[in-house]
Amino acid sequence: MDVIFLKAGIRFLGLAAVATVASGVALGPARAELLARVPAAREMAVCGDTLFVGTKGSSVYAVPLSGGRARRAASGFSAPNGVACSRGRLFVASRDRITAFEIGRGGTLNGRRDIRRGLPNSGGHSFRYIAVGPDSRLYVSFGSPCNICLPRGLQGTIASMNQDGSDLRRVAWGVRNSVGFDWRGSTMFFTDNGADRMGDDIPPDELNVLRQGGFYGFPYFGGRIRLTGFEDAPPPARQIAPVFNFQAHVAALGIHFFRSLGGDALVAQHGSWDRSVPVGYQVVRLSFRGGRPVSATPFLRDVGRPVDVKEALDGSVLVSDDAGGAIYVFRR
């Protein structure tokens, strides 16, 4: 496998033939470039010719997809991890609220309005993911506040609401910490991070299919494995098992189905901290057959700590890296 260094100092391992080019590297049919520097970059939203980027800090950034520096588009948040756009508006999911903006020319944001306040305290799992479903509702994740414990209220759930913040509904529960979901047709798939401190190889990270109102096992199960402290406790409902297991501790976060990949998905694996030999730190291609995931293979490696993946209008792959404070674009 060839090793190449970009000008930005990030290393890429080509999975096929690799040819160096002046402004980046070619990975088979793709070319890797640094699109912009964004501090602690997290979820991304492609909104016309602007890429909005949530962060772990206090600001949301706007990046011109045609090239140029990122600029601070809005501030005054507490960890505005989640961003999504619909009908000319941007929605920002932070620790304690959902905020809506009107998107103006050049990606300016106007008319700031909190549409939902008082979100549950999710402790160390307070990085909300947000997306607009095929039904035009907003879907938001609410992590559990712990490694393994009984969540309360909306902790450990995924919920949906109207775009004005009304009609909040719990659509999934028993979810430890989902920081990524997307739709394949009308079917929603979501990642979920497995528990820590149970060993190098258990429990797995999960990929699940949303069944409205379904129970996904936490804190009783991680995959099909009983979790520490709840081995003999009777679960409150029948568990909906994962449709695919990722390796334990890879920290599977953002997932996106790509038109340019024939309906396959890319998944950002943020990387382990609770394992003797580190795993993850890559983007994998999740291949589907007959509507079901069958394998996950490395697509991009050594791209820092990838958080989210999105498809630009031209089919390019966008990757956010919160550790390196960067957005990368992989052009065909």
Map each language-model feature to its residues:
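Beta-rich catalytic cores
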Residues: 40, 76-79, 126, 154, ...
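Blade-edge beta-strand/turn elements of extracellular beta-propeller
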Residues: 29-37, 67-76, 103-121, 151-180, ...
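Residue-level detector of Asp-centered blade-edge/turn motifs that repeat once per structural unit
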Residues: 46-49, 85-87, 132-135, 182-185, ...
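Beta-strand-rich domains and repeat architectures in extracellular enzymes and scaffolds
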Residues: 35-58, 250-257, 267
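Beta-propeller domain segments
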Residues: 127, 145-147, 161-164, 176-177, ...
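A short loop-to-beta-strand structural motif that recurs across blades of beta-propeller domains
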Residues: 59-61, 97-99, 157-159, 206, ...
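Residue position within the beta-strands of beta-propeller blades
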Residues: 53-54, 92, 139-141, 189-192, ...
